[in-house]
Amino acid sequence: MPPRRYNPDHRRDALLERINLDIPNAVAQALREDLGGEVDAHNDITAQLLPENSHSHAVVITREDGVFCGKRWVEEVFIQLAGDDVTLTWHVADGDVVTADQPLFEILGPSRVLLTGERTALNFVQTLSGVASEVRKYVNLLEGTHTQLLDTRKTLPGLRTALKYAVLCGGGANHRLGLSDAFLIKENHIIASGSVRQAVEKAFWLHPDVPVEVEVESLKELEEALKAGADIIMLDNFDTEQMREAVKITRGQAQLEVSGNVTIDTLREFAETGVDYISVGALTKHVRALDLSMRFR
């Protein structure tokens, strides 16, 4: 069973297991959106203008620097559209740094299928590469500190595991995958439970092997969470002086996570206070796609 204290390796393994189930479903949903509600390439009426027996060779390039992510989603798009009739040749792997004008992969197959799958495939890889690229910028700023970058549950609907995978490819780590794999006790939970101690004790009783995290908004609440035995304590909207004081008070009794008011400009300053984790919702909420293009040869 996983340890109660947060374990990035366990979270990673759980995510990769979920991904195996989620990719086919996510791709099928995206294709249905594009093809009139069913995964049928014949519903692309513009592609029907091409001869049925026409075959083409295309290459996908990046127009800007970044970090690549999304290989399996691209493969799944063309598997669902054409089975083995499309051949993909890869020049990069997930997590690779890419530079402007670099070829990423090549596609050989029926011209109609290549055109039908183009936008769906690029939507996935541009979105995931955009997240991985942004995460890498944050991770690079943490170099030399012991602080680890975490994502959050603030993800685009339907793309939770995909976006969290992109965070891994960028060098970050995953917070909770969902509501079932860790406790995160916030203000309303505490009010409804009666106290921090009561909430934490109930969590330990319900699932002794699951991490228990408590969100606090003051140093007083921090001390209450420590006394209750929380594994992880989230410092919500603390300033840097409060963060340093929290590190002194905690003395390794729990892991500390910073959340709120985190930007690429404040990240390093927060990390240098000595906290264990910094979580950033914007990584998977404010997504900027990487600029990619597919060109027929």
Predicted feature descriptions by range:
Residues 293-297:
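Active-site loop ensemble at the mouth of alpha/beta enzyme cores that anchors a bound cofactor
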Residues 237, 260, 282:
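Short secondary-structure boundary segments
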Residues 2-228, 232, 244-249, 255-257, ...:
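Acidic/glycine-rich phosphate/pyrophosphate-binding loops and surrounding catalytic core
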